[in-house]
Amino acid sequence: MIFKLNVRGAILVAAAITGLVTLASPARADRCDDSAKELTNQVERLKVNFRAANVVYLSHPAAKELSVGCRGDKYSIELYAKGDRKPTPEFFSLVGSMAAIVFTVTKDDTTTGATRCLKRMGLLRGDKVVMRYRRLNMECTRTKTDASIAITRGKDE
């Protein structure tokens, strides 16, 4: 018995299998997109502004700037918030609830850490405070007009 090789049929079958495999696999969203979507669903008055590279920019009335960044060279995910020089309790609550959702830590812990970091800035410690609280790296900076906090988690954690 001699088998005849049908090239057209083989190519057609291979193309059909490839098409089925690509259609069957679900499209995966980026972790930044997932985090931003979860934040907007759970935090009131929070809106997504736009996405640029690995950063999703958000807006809220209690903060001047908000962003969620993913996959930096030294961190796996970052939350950045900027507010007035003297942050309000609403700002502390916003940062705490956002960090709790992004980093899956309790809201009390993240609010306490953010409050400690932002309140340590002053005459004795200066305008830049770096601290670690509950496996989160917090860096608070202050200028003449505003104060900001960047909360990150390292790649190895």
What is each model feature region?
Residues 2-14:
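Bacterial N-terminal signal peptides that target proteins for export
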Residues 128-155:
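Short, exposed beta-strand-loop hairpins at the edges of beta-sheets
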Residues 16-17, 27:
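Cleavable N-terminal signal peptides
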Residues 27, 48-57, 104-134:
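Short glycine-rich, low-complexity/disordered patches
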Residues 70-121:
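Long, charged/polar, surface-exposed segments that mediate recognition or autoinhibition
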Residues 38-43, 76-81, 124-128, 147-152:
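Extracellular/mature segments of secreted proteins
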Residues 30-74:
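N-terminal secretory signal peptides
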Residues 23-29:
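Sec/Tat signal peptide C-region and signal peptidase I cleavage site
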